Amino acid sequence: MTLVSSELVEGINQLLQVLTTALQQLRVHRAKTRVWGYNRLHDQLTAHAVKLADFQDALIARLLVMDAHVDLQNVGRLRIGQTVEDILASERGLALESVQLCQRLHETSRIDVFTRVLIEKLALSEDERLQSYDQSLELIRQLGTPQFLSTRC
């Protein structure tokens, strides 16, 4: 059994909750964009969901290696967008929450190197998504939704 701090286990489980919420929200958003015919956006959301699922699997594995409790019982509130702009904004919110949790976990004093590297990779990936959402939302503001959709989705 690995000696691990309860703060770290709690933090990883909080991160798992955010990822579980994000995956469920992405499931609905992917379906909506597919039905609406926005294939490029659908493909982007699908690629993001695959990455998140891989990170979720890796975090679960880390907890199991630590002989710690894996808590997947709680899913946060889903913020299902009714428009493409709403979808991007709600996905941005969860990406930001993930980045903030990763930063807090990274500062945990008793964190092993494998978990630290995993959290750094997740933070980097989510930060890239955050920048992508910010860029898309800014383009919507500048171009308007119809023009954005015709050129980007």
Regions found by a protein language model. Name each.
Residues 1-153:
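Iron-associated oxidoreductase/ferritin-like identity signal
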